[in-house]
Structures are given as structure tokens and as C-alpha cells.
């Protein structure tokens, strides 16, 4: 047992962030820019940052702006399409671009190392989906954020938008697509490493790799004590504030903290796989992110897409994701993760959520039965001329969907949720999509809830507006501000200078 007196000043921190992924690194950069003297510790159990969900191959989608993802615009029972989530995600991603633009202007990061621009396309070929896409286009394009969206059912034009997608299609097939040319591909692994390179030069931010959090405790109103274990030794550090940003590992850490707010949460792990193509004769002929619509009855996570990705500078095509199931909460986790997470407070909610999501379980079972031939068959809905030999299977990351006890029983949630202690001294980010692309907006919300007093000071307000000039404004209702923000972002990040 460690006692407070055994902890030296070098192991006392203003903030301790668990997990060296995009969430913790974003929060660390924000805190450091707002208070350069703040002592921050980042703890990562693996030997390098960004190896779990932040890694580009592990991340289900990059450059999320709700331009083309159907799961953010569901069809309602009244025949209307719900677009509020798409508007929220789009403005959140613009905040991320704004933040990166400011850091680039200050020389902290280089956009060329992690950011590429390419069109985002929604593509359909079924009769019911044609009507859905047209209505989606009409509703979204009436909003300022999406007013540059294009729609077409002209096959000649669509062949210009996505040549290899249109090759080999039956002449009688009806197709349609929408396009937003101002789309992005983001290598969040590269961005995270760039964040850490900048932070390590500060002297006030410390990163400890190959270090695992064994326990988290707090006595009264004292700082949090975190018991750590590295390859060399075991020791304890103190943190006035703790952020659990360990992806799928955040739930178990939240449970260890013992805060009552985390008592009724559980998790349902879902693994993923991609078909990957690195053949230049294929990759050179496709430069877009193309999203289709999920089959009727399939869960939102099943939305198929053909992604152009630049990963560590190399252009690849990824198709999927194909879902799977195992009991790990992290890609490099333990098969006991799910079982260890079951407690008296969440077992009822987990059982009820399972019973209410039999269709999801059936879907996952079906995905597990697929072989390479059946996966390529799915790919050929997008690329009729795709050749099996050009594509190989790659294991993606783990996502842990939130199971939450509510007044109506256990519910499975598909988004992200921040769980905080009543005094704001500890916060955990649970869930998955859209995740990385909205990290800046998520972390600003965390600052409001956990650092509210400092957030109200003039110095923090001024520094935030230096980082995010539109801070405090609603971009979806302020057309002139949105235009000015996008013009600035495009100029500083280099939109139009490449991939066009």
C-alpha cells in the first residue's frame, strides 16, 4: 500500500491522462496551450502512442464530417430524415479543422503529415435507397453547412466522380450519388504522434510508455492516487484531475475508480476487419470515400464504405468494415476483459440489452461465418470488377459499445458518452463513433464540466479563441462565421493544393 508521503514532487501532477491516443493527446494539447505551466502526465500501457483505436488501420472511419455517412441521417417513421446529428458532427469536425489550422499556424504540427483532401460520396443502387438519397440531399443541401453538396444520377458524370466504382455495372442498373468535394482523410495515428512530439518539447508534459494502471483510488477530497506498473517497477502517482481516455480500456478503469456515476455502465465489444488493397493500378484510379447504405435490419456499424486512406504516407483502399466478436475490450487486450467488467451494478442491464439486441447478435454471427469469397462478393457491390487477388484481410481495432442502465432498463448505445464524477475531478470517455474526428469538441465539453471555473476566466477564454476563433459561436446558424472559418481552415491546412 502506498501512502501520500511516499510520493515525491516529481510524481504529483495537475492532470493524469490514461491512454496515449487521439483523445488524451488532444486534451493534453488543449490544457498545455491554456496553461503552459500545468504538470501533465500521460500513461500508456503499450510501447508507443496511437497503437489501439487511434491507429489508421484500426479506425473505422476517418475524416468524419457526416458528409456521406447514412447512419448519421436515419429515416424516421414519419418519412422525414433526421439531420440534427449530421449537423452536430459537421460543426464538431470543423472545430477540429480549426484547431489543427491554429496549431499549424503556430508551427506545432504540419498538416501534410496527417491530412489529405478528397471528395466524400454517398452512393446507392437500390430503388428504395435512390429515394432516400434524394430526400437526404434535399434536406441537407438546404442547410448552410451542406449547401455545396452535389447530386447526380447521370452515369457519365458518376464515372468521372468514381471511375472504378462505375466500371462493370449493368447498363440497366439505376444508380445515384451525392458528393461533397471538400472532404478529408485523416491519419489520426500520425496526428497523435505529432501532438506528442510537440508536447515532449514543453518540459511540463510527461509521457510514460509501457506503463499500466493497476488501480485508481481516492481518499476524501485528496488528489487521485494511481498505482502504476512498468517493466522496471511499481509505484504511485497523484493527480488532481484524471482522464480515462483508454478507448475500450476506459470502462474497467472507470470501475476501478469507484465513482458512483460509473456503477451502472457495461460494455459490448465488437471487433472489425477490412479488405485492403495496395495495388497501385487500383489505388491510383480511386480518390474518394464512398459510403453505401446498410442492408435493412443491419446495425448502424455495418454501413459499408470504400475508403481511400493515406497511412504513413502510403495510399491504400480499405473496404468494410466487416464485424466480428471476441471478448477483448482492446485489440491488444485480454479475452477476460468482458467477463471482468461484469459487476452487480451492470449485470442486469447487460442481460437486458443482450435480449433486446438479438438482431445484432445474429448479424455478428453471420459476419463470423464469412470467408474471403463472401467478403469479396460484398466488395463487388461497390467494385464490380474487383479481383480477389488484389485484396487481403486486415484486422481492425476493437470498439466497445456502451451498455447503460436507464429508467427503461439496459440500453445499448452506439455513440460516445463522457462519464464524470460529481466534482469533475475524474472523467471517462466511453463508446465509439464518431470519436476521433470530433475529439476537439468532446474535449472542450470536458473542459467545461471539469475545469468550469478556469474556463470562465478571461485568460482561458482569450487563449481558446486564439486556438478556435469561432469558439462560442453556432456555426450551423451563422453563415458568415462558417464561411470565414472554412476559408481560414482551407488556407492554413492547404485545401486545394493537393489531391485535386
Curated annotation (Swiss-Prot):
According to its UniProt entry, this protein's organism is Prochlorococcus marinus (strain MIT 9211)
**Is Phosphoprotein one of the keywords UniProt gives this record?**
no
- Which EC numbers characterise this protein's activity in its record? 1.1.5.4
| Pathway entry | Carbohydrate metabolism; tricarboxylic acid cycle; oxaloacetate from (S)-malate (quinone route): step 1/1
Cofactor(s) required for function per UniProt: FAD
Give UniProt keywords alphabetically: FAD, Flavoprotein, Oxidoreductase, Tricarboxylic acid cycle
| Domain of life according to the entry | Bacteria
Q: Which Gene3D superfamilies match?
A: D-Amino Acid Oxidase, subunit A, domain 2, FAD/NAD(P)-binding domain
What InterPro entries does its record include?
A: FAD/NAD-bd_sf, MQO
What is the enzyme's class at the highest EC level?
Answer: oxidoreductase
Catalytic function, reaction form? (S)-malate + a quinone = a quinol + oxaloacetate
Q: Keyword Disulfide bond: yes or no?
A: no
| Stated family | Belongs to the MQO family.
UniProt name for this protein: Probable malate:quinone oxidoreductase
HAMAP family, A to Z: MQO
Q: Name one GO molecular function term.
A: 2-hydroxyglutarate dehydrogenase activity
Gene symbol here is: mqo
GO biological process per UniProt: tricarboxylic acid cycle
> Pfam families annotated for this entry?
Mqo (PF06039)
